Amino acid sequence: LIAAWAVEAEKVFIYMRDEYPAVLKILRTEISALEKKKIVSPGYIDLRRGAGAYICGEESAMIESIEGKRGIPRHRPPFVAQVGIFNRPTLVHNVETLHWIARICREGPEILNSVEKNGRKGLRSYSVSGRVNNPGVHLLPAGSTITDIIEAAGGMRKGHKFKAYQPGGPSSGILPASMDDIPVSYTHLRAHETNS
C-alpha cells in the first residue's frame, strides 16, 4: 500500500495464481480487514485470480490476464508504464520486491549488503518443490548452490536421490546433480545456457 500511495495509484490489483487457495483466502481476509478499518476504500484493492500460466509472470501478459484475456505478452512500445491495465499507466511490482523494500526501510540496507556468498551479495527467496522434506520458499544468501538450497529444504526425502534440478521456470533447462556446486544465479548459470 505504501508503494501505491507513493505513486498516487487510483487502484491496486493483486494477481495471484489460482493454485494457491490458502494464500487467496489470507489475502481476502486481509483486504477485508483493511476495508473495515477504513485504511482503504472498498474495492481499492482488486484481487484477481490467475489461471496459472507461467508466462503471466511477464508484466504485460499478466495485465492481459487481469483484463480477462489470454495471458500473452504485448508488443512494445507502448510500455505498460504508458499504456497498461485497461489502457491506463501502470506500475508493476513483484511482491518479493515490495517485501524487500519494507524490510530495508525497517532494518536498514545491512540486511542485504552484509550477506555475501560466491561473489553475490544479499538474500534471495528460493522456491523449492520436489522430493525434499520441507518444500516451500526458503530465504538464503544470493550465491547459494542447489546443495545449499536442498539442505535448507530439509534434505531429500527418505528413499529419494537427487538426480537433476531445474534452477528456474520452464525455460531454464534442467541440470544434472553433478552440477550441484554452481551458484543458482543468473550470472553463474548463464555460462551453462540456463538461468534462474
What is the role of each PLM region?
Residues 141-148, 194:
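Short, structural beta-strand-to-alpha-helix junction motif
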Residues 1-5:
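Histidine-anchored nucleotide/phosphate-binding helix
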Residues 11-18, 166:
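Short internal beta-strands
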Residues 18, 160-163, 175-176:
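Terminal amphipathic helices with adjacent charged low-complexity linkers/tails
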Residues 24-142, 153-157:
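Hydrophobic alpha-helical positions that pack around
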Residues 149, 187:
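Conserved adenylation A10 loop of the ANL superfamily
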Residues 139, 166-177, 181-184:
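Accessory "access/gating" subregions that flank catalytic or transport cores
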